[in-house]
Amino acid sequence: MGVKNMKKDKIILTDCDGVILDWEEGFSVWMEHHGHKKVEGYQFLYNIGQRYGMSSEAGNKLVKQFNESAAIGFLPPLRDAQFFVKKLHEQHQYKFICITSLSLDPYAKYLRERNLKKLMGDAFIDVICLDTGADKDKILKDYGIKYPNNYWIEDKPENVDWGIDAGLKGILIEHGHNMDY
């Protein structure tokens, strides 16, 4: 994967989980397999600990464990993301750069890249993995300088705002947890 000699206006920056891949579905199945049940109204909660009636710390540990498991390499596409990513790439020559707070584990990154390639072909030219749950404000400042006015697609409102502050065009993917944004 590389970004050499690409038209900067044909690059779309995107989060992965909750935008391109259906992380929630994979995580829900994994949690159920491990004996955890969601609380009522879970679909409106972003915090995983709250979704499963546990502390935020316990929820974050389980997220990290899931993100570094083999299951992370087999997530399905979110809604119609596969259709539109492939259409933008194949018919309009767009390339995608993924910025995700997945994990710093190299095996997790390998599985993420493999999952994206299997579903999206060669649409993704780079996958940047930050630590599990890491903020994206600093990296978005860097990418806002490199790709000013390019699209930034995300499902977490504060990350959309950080992208806009960095000079990117922010698009929020709708989920129950961000309906009040």
Regions found by a protein language model. Name each.
Residues 149-181:
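Acidic, Mg2+-coordinating phosphoryl-transfer loop and its flanking beta/alpha structural elements
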